[in-house]
Amino acid sequence: MTTTTDLVSYEDALASYDPVMGLEVHVELGTKTKMFCGCSTALGADPNTQTCPVCLGMPGALPVVNATGVESAIRIGLALNCEIAEWCRFARKNYFYPDMPKNFQTSQYDEPIAFDGYLDVQLEDGETFRVQIERAHMEEDTGKSLHVGGATGRIHGASHSLLDYNRAGIPLIEIVTKPIEGAGERAPEVARAYVRELRELIRALGVSEARMEMGQMRCDVNLSLRPHGTEKFGTRSETKNVNSLRSVERAARFEIQRHAAVLSSGGTIVQETRHFHEDTGSTTSGRVKEEAEDYRYFPEPDLVPVAPSREWVEEIRSALPELPLVRRNRLREEWGISGNDMQSILNAGALDPIVATIDAGADAASARKWWMGELARSANESGKALDELAITPVQVARVAELVTKGELNDKLARQVILGVLAGEGTPDEVVDKRGLKVVSDEGALTAAVDEAIAGNPGVADKIRGGKVAAAGALVGAVMKATRGQADAARVKELILEKLGVTEG
Amino acid sequence: MPGITREEVAHLARLARLELKPEELEHFAGQLDDIIGAVARVSEVADQDVPPTSHPLPLTNVMRPDEVRPSLTPEQALSGAPAQEQQRFKVPQILGEE
């Protein structure tokens, strides 16, 4: 589609209008089976090999709730500081679309399992913003459509569609915020920070891997503008399936600029769904949103109510792990680093590898140095995530240990790491195979130092004359002679000793 | 309580993908009106202190453990499909159907 959309500059939009956002995030739970039947949820299976009469919506088939799905929903609710319903039901959300063979989605309507919570999120500059949570409810995912006959699998122009129902019925938790007000120009940043914090939280709870690129976590961005000084919300648009952190921020920003252009030229915003396009960062019109009552929600007659006992809820609460924001703040203090440093670590996905490396015996500074230095560089070059590199935290800890013991210097350690990444074996094996040991044999070092002094009489004289800085050239000569395997600090000591100068 | 209008029945029919003739709209509007009237009388009796019934059995928390059960084979799953292709259910074009 080549339709262009009028935009005003972001600054101009914010000068006239105040954005209000609502974020809906769907999280696919990592349960072994679907929400209402025992079909596997394993990824990558052949089409329609993980279906049964229940998830295909066959007449007479009866759903039964997955206990782990309910427990995960309660865990998420508690971690979001929500109240947990004492009694709640599922509801049928009726609609005709081939992605749901039942012609309804089993969801929750007016009785969500969790409600009235909040999540504190940290912005890049360390400021904390509290996002209020309206509800978290249980529902199920839809099947996957493959559109045939149009350009590159797009729905437009397709002659027909092919449905795989392996995904239909996989448990989803939908987490809905209350309207996010007061973020002003930082609204897109708040949206991104919220989704990131939520992702960290979901992972820490162990209920899902929440990999956005695999559709395990998907975000809808609702956005409206109101003129400054007014209370009443404007008409909102709902941008569906925004599937990366960067896209969440871009989608919010684009919609602010688009709405402002429409409103300031005297137009009105249509309440509709919009599609986000990764390539251009823009949104285009989808279908006009059906009113909620058009879904004709009613209580699901085939499922009995879920009434989590208070004992169960408290048991789940007491087993919650340390939550990500609390953990990050604790580690930041323990490591004595700034908020910016911590943010870089998070952005690089290095937090867990660093913690694992420290757990394996490394000191915090070395663990950070290797993961944020050599390894981050290597990951960048190969386009991989840090945890996908062919080196384990235990191996990084071993490299750090060899450096601490003086058996490797940083330069050699870097080579060891490259060797491990290249599949040459464990750090110790790489040290052996590549012959990477610091020359600590004083005899050999002394000989190399003598040779360097003899070969550079001019430099030696300068040093004798008090120009200690000139020693660098001799250190370099020794390092070259030992193929980088000497301890540079020790070499410098020896040179100064030989030439009868002290550092100062 | 005002009853259900003909327009509302037409709207519901559209949502349910039912094609109704004008005389059928009339007919169902009358019938649905009677049903809604009957339910409304129940609501008059049931006050806030009466919990809503969603199931005839007084059960809660019927759950199953998260254990994989055998699925249908794709052949079985697709056996009732009017059309199939690439081991998938084949359906007509989705957009532009209205």
From Swiss-Prot, chain B:
Q: Name one GO biological process term.
A: regulation of translational fidelity
This protein's UniProt keywords: ATP-binding, Ligase, Nucleotide-binding, Protein biosynthesis
Tell me the Pfam families matching this sequence: GatC
Q: List where this protein forms a coiled coil.
A: none
What InterPro entries does the record point to?
Asp/Glu-ADT_sf_sub_c (IPR036113), GatC (IPR003837)
Question: GO molecular-function annotation terms?
Answer: asparaginyl-tRNA synthase (glutamine-hydrolyzing) activity; ATP binding; glutaminyl-tRNA synthase (glutamine-hydrolyzing) activity
Q: Which PANTHER family match?
A: GLUTAMYL-TRNA(GLN) AMIDOTRANSFERASE SUBUNIT C, MITOCHONDRIAL
Family named by the database record: Belongs to the GatC family.
NCBIfam families in alphabetical order? gatC
What is the official name of this protein in its record? Glutamyl-tRNA(Gln) amidotransferase subunit C
Per the UniProt record, the source organism is Streptomyces coelicolor (strain ATCC BAA-471 / A3(2) / M145)
- Recall the taxonomic lineage recorded for the source organism: Bacteria, Bacillati, Actinomycetota, Actinomycetes, Kitasatosporales
Q: Which gene encodes it?
A: gatC
